[in-house]
Amino acid sequence: MAAVILEDGAESYTTKGGIVVTRRRREASYSDAIAGYVDRLDERRGAVFSSNYEYPGRYTRWDTAVVDPPLAISSFGRSLWIEAYNERGEVLLALIAEDLKSVADITLGSLAARRLDLTINEPDRVFTEEERSKMPTVFTVLRAVTNLFHSEEDSNLGLYGAFGYDLAFQFDAIELKLSRPDDQRDMVLFLPDEILVVDHYAAKAWIDRYDFARENLSTEGKAADIAPEPFRSVDSIPPHGDHRPGEYAELVVKAKESFRRGDLFEVVPGQKFYERCESRPSEISNRLKAINPSPYSFFINLGNQEYLVGASPEMFVRVSGRRIETCPISGTIKRGDDPIADSEQILKLLNSKKDESELTMCSDVDRNDKSRVCVPGSVKVIGRRQIEMYSRLIHTVDHIEGRLRDDMDAFDGFLSHAWAVTVTGAPKLWAMRFIESHEKSPRAWYGGAIGMVGFNGDMNTGLTLRTIRIKDGIAEVRAGATLLYDSNPEEEEAETELKASAMIAAIRDAKSANSAKSARDVAAVGAGVSILLVDHEDSFVHTLANYFRQTGASVTTVRTPVAEEIFDRVKPDLVVLSPGPGTPKDFDCKATIKKARARDLPIFGVCLGLQALAEAYGGDLRQLAIPMHGKPSRIRVLEPGIVFSGLGKEVTVGRYHSIFADPSNLPREFVITAESEDGTIMGIEHSKEPVAAVQFHPESIMTLGGDAGMRMIENVVAHLAKRAKTKAA
């Protein structure tokens, strides 16, 4: 039934189960709406889900929050219970309980005003593989609830929360060897009556408030009060983790024996790290969101002093209409210190056959999971080994889609993928048995999923990775690595520690006001220094000027030829000869250099500027056999001198030249400070005069690594410029 507009502006529609839903919308502050919800979750049940990571065709930015939901559905094993937290929840519980009476495959237990207990019956027949997702499980109840509230009129109303790892064993059972704690919950899903939605593209936020009614039952006018349960910290200090150093590497060796026998192709065991929570969960959530943006950021208060704080990079299952999507992640490398180092790491990752094999196996298993529930021929890889970059890691990701068959729904798709091979392994069932036999503790929420099941039939869930579980004041961080036959045990152990590091940093630094690593500050060595930059019709001269200005120097750029009155007016402390096309003779560089030397001015040459200085002092120039235009080179620093002081023995630089100074005929007063691998001069300094030059471009993107180019410019301004030398004296 289509929604109708009521006199007070509210909207009303009737669900498939005959429930009349009334929705009232009010505007909220876009700038700070989500912050208030995050703070409230320290002492109130609910969830905040955010995407603060964008990827075209895959992820956009959004926020959704629910606090003080009136009802929750929880389970452990085949036991399930539905709890009402206030009078409004009592109405919802009564509506659901009445509907569940007609659901086969469940046994209803005790029913009170605020709690319904029930049991999922064991299957009474053999289910084929094609219909395995229809077996009696806790999802039987979830299907009934979503069917009761089903409507196409609202895309936000649904169930919000977390799905635990052990739910997979209702779909495909294995022998459990690890003991589960008595208070473990495999699922906690909230049914909200108020939802905050933040639309970042429209820069708007609003709150939808819902009332529910059927026959003589209605939430209208019922009390919504729920008592808070403040977070409680503890004084006890937990152990470092559930593995001693080197023990995970030993597990890798055991896994390789399984690979050798053919029992497994890959497996993803994890280890757990502990930290005491000295900050509130909300502070940890804010910190993690700031330092580790992700498409599935979440903060959930599950009640009973249990919280989940996470920044998952991986979609689990997303269903929109009949379309089902997943984005398996496998292949990981550490971020570089800057964009140039990142690019080198990306090349290394893409060239890694091991990482390619990891992702290939993950995606082949994922395609198999979809083939169980999708229309034949509809399962397609729409993105292959695409790069996604996060705060500390770079991943390779595939994007796979399919179309659900008409007899399948989002829950079928969800169950068929439980759990992703990226957190289990392949073959999946054997990998899960290996994990159960070799991990030190039950996974609880790790490796499961978080997110939302819409009453319109859609679903949006992320894998529970990069997650902090806080239980009774102690934080747990679990991280795993994808193991293959050619895995290096020590490297895999280090990868688990690296993956956990961002979570641990968020716990330890939650009270820090700084949300991100600050860039290196440029030294203000140029204050009071005047620089004359001679432009040889170059296309990079303004970037070069920008670098010098960052030191605090005053820069005047003048195209050659430079008149005497320019020198008199600018009164430079340093003359910089820019790069340019052609040869130094095309710009009569000797004349410029002669004027500068007559005034005893320091000179720094870049590219063409080096060639000009070498030629002006009596040297010869030659032409490269192969031009170096826009090409990076690894150069050797022979003498640090002025320019390369504080840099390493090797530096990657950007080159744009066909001409070079002949080293066999370089005037003896010049010292070669750097050269390329083939012996081409890359840097010179005069032994007696304040003159230095480089053949490459310090301002190029290719010289950004380690901020090398900027550091060279700082050195030139600090130690070559005339006024700088005077100050130093």
From Swiss-Prot:
Keyword Kinase listed: no
InterPro entries for the chain: ADC_synthase, Anth_synth_I-like, Anth_synth_I_N, Chorismate_C, Class_I_gatase-like, GATASE, TrpE-G_bact, TrpG/PapA_dom
Keyword Transmembrane appears in the UniProt entry: no
Sites where the protein binds L-glutamine: 580-582, 611, 658-659
EC top class named in words: lyase
UniProt GO BP: L-tryptophan biosynthetic process
EC numbers on record: 4.1.3.27
Entry annotation: catalytic residues: 607, 697, 699
Gene3D superfamilies: 3.40.50.880, Anthranilate synthase
Xref: Pfam families: Anth_synt_I_N (PF04715), Chorismate_bind (PF00425), GATase (PF00117)
Cystines in this chain: none
GO molecular function: anthranilate synthase activity
Keywords: Amino-acid biosynthesis, Aromatic amino acid biosynthesis, Glutamine amidotransferase, Lyase, Tryptophan biosynthesis
Glutamine amidotransferase type-1 domain mapped to chain residues: 530-726
Pathway: Amino-acid biosynthesis; L-tryptophan biosynthesis; L-tryptophan from chorismate: step 1/5
Top-rank taxon: Bacteria
Catalysed reaction, written as an equation: chorismate + L-glutamine = anthranilate + pyruvate + L-glutamate + H(+)
PANTHER family named in the record: AMINOBENZOATE/ANTHRANILATE SYNTHASE, ANTHRANILATE SYNTHASE COMPONENT 1
Protein name as annotated: Anthranilate synthase
Native organism: Rhizobium meliloti (strain 1021) (Ensifer meliloti)
